[in-house]
């Protein structure tokens, strides 16, 4: 299922410092492949706006879990950024589009 408005509000407030980033292994690999630091990741997250929002969709493994997808840029590279709420932390997925 998909929708055209974010499921989660205030992602920037939840992810306000490097210590707040909770990353999947896939996200860590994507960040490393792009050549980003965690500081770069945090900067991208803090600069996201509704103009970057792409879609919300349910997770393949569990249709009750929503994921918000944003498109952004970093140093001329187009990024696909996905957030998912799990307990009290967001899991962040980064990859090049």
Task: Identify what each model region corresponds to.
Residues 10-64:
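Compact soluble domain cores
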Residues 77-80, 84-97:
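Enriched for short, Lys/Arg-rich terminal
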Residues 1-4:
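Intrinsically disordered, low-complexity and often Lys/Arg-enriched segments
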Residues 60-84:
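Basic/aromatic recognition patch in beta-strand/loop cores that engages polyanionic ligands
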